[in-house]
């Protein structure tokens, strides 16, 4: 049985701003772009979240919810440096590390000799060291697979630890609301509710075939998650192929015009994610992904196209024309050139 830890820093960017400027502590704080330039919230303090402010929200909306919100421009050089320090701590326990972002990672400690192989004690020690050495907090989840470890890390946020043992998996998953499953947004949850499915226990009552008929290949994934099954390995040093931002809408967007209205906010968030990349990648082909109301999806990309609003408008128009029906999800992204991988290939010759 595997032992997987999911580590997630608590409001990472905001935590570092408060660490480096004590006058910000205890304040409603958001890190992100200017509200005058369609800026979005990269992250925010828990004091800001109490007002309803959330990551990826338009900064203008955030300020309406919390007029006293303090807005700080991001310092990605600082965030990258601290992320490297956190990963150095991880490597003291295992080399099997899969980074998801600057502030989030999976660790496979199945074969780790530390603390007699106790994943719980390893997670406790990582949390202690990050707090003592870097003066920020992280939350951790321990479980037999990645799906459950990620859910566990969110269970007692902030500054928490939650453990799901192999013996607890079946009962824990049975009580989970289907909305907790990866890929299940509000629209899918409502669709499942109309089928009488609200928990994973409800999902288990049906057959895998019926879910596949209703949701396509996603139905098979749903069935596996409802049974606590996730065989995905921790992918060590997996090089990124792309950077993207996706949004699943509470209500399907009825036409192309409605889809186009969502582009500026999505592109602002995409630009923020691109800024967080290290220098071993170079942005290449832009792409747009659409998922229609019937769960069919399409992706359009174009070599040589720019990454400006007009280029994405054209790609979105092409993607919409392939389905020409209401849209439940829009994704925008960029394929990446792996400069590090290319350099390593050259060295081989």
UniProtKB/Swiss-Prot annotation:
Family annotation (InterPro entries): DNA/RNA_pol_sf, DNA_pol_Y-fam_lit_finger_sf, DNA_pol_Y-fam_little_finger, DNA_polymerase-Y, DNApol_IV, IMS_HHH_1, Rev_trsase/Diguanyl_cyclase, UmuC
Disulphide-bonded residues: none
Domain UmuC: 4-185
Cofactor binding annotation: Binds 2 magnesium ions per subunit.
The family this protein is said to belong to: Belongs to the DNA polymerase type-Y family.
PANTHER family linked: DNA POLYMERASE KAPPA (PTHR11076:SF33), DNA REPAIR POLYMERASE UMUC / TRANSFERASE FAMILY MEMBER (PTHR11076)
Protein name: DNA polymerase IV
